[in-house]
Amino acid sequence: MQYYDEVQEVNERRKRRILAYYEYIDARTRDQMAEVVHKLIEQRQSQGLSQQNIAEATGMAAPNIARLESCKRIPTMQVLAKYADAVGMEINIEVVPIAKNVAEED
């Protein structure tokens, strides 16, 4: 019985680590996307454009632009690229090292 308990404990720790890592990645991704979206909003506003103007330029529905700007969901790259193009910008992705990895903790 002791071996079974040890295996269960190892599995539980693994599940907790995986969940913590998922939450970390989700939060980091949301923060990064929010930063990009806020830069696009600033650009839109500096040009005096409305959400409706962006909707017309991108072929997207105005409510979808509002939803994008609310940062409640993580947008696709295609959606970000359309919006960026509408305000004369482009999305540039970089791969850079991170200082700390949650998966390596524990």
Where are these regions (language model features)?
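Recognition helix of helix-turn-helix/homeodomain-like DNA-binding domains
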Residues: 56-74
